[in-house]
Amino acid sequence: IVLSVKSSNPVIFQKGNKITGTVVDAAGIPIIGANVMVKGTTNGAVTDINGKFSLNVEKGDLLEVSYIGYLSYEQKIGNEQALAITLKEDTKTLDEVVVVGYGTQKRGNLTGSIATVKSEEMTVAPVSSTINSLGGRLPGLVSQQTSGQPGADQATIKVRGFADNAIWIVDGIETDFNRVDPNQIESITVLTDILDKAKYGPMASDGALLIRTKKGGYNTPMQIHVDMEGGIGIADRIPEWVNGIEYARMNNAARAVSGYSQLYLPEALEGFSQKDPYDMKYPNVDYKSLMLKETLPLSRVGVNFNGGGDRVKYNFSFNGLYSGDIVKNSASNDYSKLNASASLTAKVGKYIEVSADFNTLLSFRRKGRTSWYNYRSVPAVAFPLTLGQSLGDDGARLNTPIYGVSRTFTQNYYALGLEGGFNTERNRTGMLNTSIDLDLSWLIKGLKSRTLLGLTQFVRTTIGKEEDYLGYYWTSQDGIGAISTHTGTKKSGKSILSSYTMQSLSFYERLSYDWAANGHKIAAGATFVMNDNTNKSNDNYQRQLYVTADISYAYTDKYIVEFVAQYAGSSRFNKDNRFAFFPSAGLAWVISKENFMRDIRWIDNLKLHTQVGLIGETDIFGAPYLYQSDYSAATNGMWLGANSKQDSWFGTNRYVTQYVTMNRL
């Protein structure tokens, strides 16, 4: 049993004497972003744009330097104060077998470039969203996170700057990446080149990310791993809000520039300077301090069983995660999820292997009816936080406060967070993938078949209650005046606010053939894929079909040619324009393997490659079935008749065209 506690940040603590250094490659070019760590600790740094780093270490520490595509470097620290480190390229990666295009291929025999990240690089910190663990770990992949709300903090992913519509293929099935726990992932491969994307059809026009999950191993004793992780999230670079006295002075200055008289007289400025959020006439509310904490908690626990015998291998995983929030005035802002997965693979005879993978995820996102950023729209002097306690019919004071609002700013977001109710967004996901692999070498040497069937169902239900608070405004003449839109409504029970169900069915069949002799290598294949997606909430149904043929030829691993031809169709278009043909081709020349390069030792691998082709795109104008009319009813028609009755009418919502088809990129 391996029990480990991981920190939330791999670089959190430094000690001892300071050393500096530079990391370069064999040509002397600085390596940007190399990891420099004291082995076995969390003490580390990352090289800057000039390949330089600084780090506090102690004598006897073992320094480890690593970067993707290069061999790791280790050095024991003595009395050095400056280090010059040269990393050598990992040429073994050229012989690495990588997943690409529903199959595998040697990295060195590709006419394009791919990037891969391993599972251990994704689990250095607990994150509520799996996508967030990819930031900065894959070249060509841009991760942008725009929210830190628990359960809504997923980053958007762009491959080589394209739109955030890259698809995720998990064990051959397209799905939402966030439905897979990072600890279940074996590796992730990013496909960015034309040929690699073409093999996955029109849905991969913006790129594809291939995820392989852990499967266990044959003839491997059972291993049990227990991981516990904890961390703290810190709100970074939140803008400062102006306080009441600052707001009043800037308002007066702006009015003076425009030729208006001052709105806030010295008496008001003196009142705002007291910084009293409950002052009836001169409130000064510090919403940031009232609303936000400086940190939020993160924790994760996971248990994994894996192993296998001669005929069967298995992997079972159970994970739980909790993320708090930085919001103070709502007890219902947090996110938790539970994930369980099981993978079984068995050899049936000499030529057959079957597998079944099941994954289920249950998540709960609790939130109030407001967010912290809503406070930015309300000046600190708009109204007092509360105006005291409300009174019952008998004149007795009730527990419900009277919250302040104004005629201009009619929403007290502090009150809305406390008294406005809450909702819980519950997401349930179930995924089942089954596959059969046939070795047909008894029929034709090098011939293989793979059949895959996948079913995914996603259900989102939002349960909660929407309530109201008692809102009043202060006037100098009338005292307290009621705002009729805030009635103090309370509800005894919760109800279903919304529901959404999505179901996907995928079928995949591939025949592949490999042949090699006398320096010649051929890899060929034919693939049929069908994807059905049904939104059961509104009966929206879509289907995609495509057939792909691909062939790759390599001579002495120096000269490489690839061809891909695909015939793809989508139900989004009229039957006469649903299908289209997309050819692609690629060439590569591994110059470093030529005889005239043997004496140039500072170059380990040099490849010249190019690709050209067409890729389809189905997501046109954001809506399917543009060849069909879409009607709606309205009641704001013409006033007709003696009684001036306004009639109802029906009208189309869009122009109909029979000629829209796939984009060709």
Regions found by a protein language model. Give the residues of each.
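Short, solvent-exposed aromatic-acidic interface loops
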Residues: 229-233, 366, 610
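Extracellular/periplasmic, surface-exposed regions of secreted and cell-surface proteins
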Residues: 122, 164-165, 343-352, 357-362, ...
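Localized chelating/binding microdomains
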Residues: 126, 130, 156-158, 198, ...
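Short, small/polar-rich motifs associated with maturation and membrane association
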Residues: 1-340, 353-355
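Active-site-proximal polar cores
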Residues: 471-473
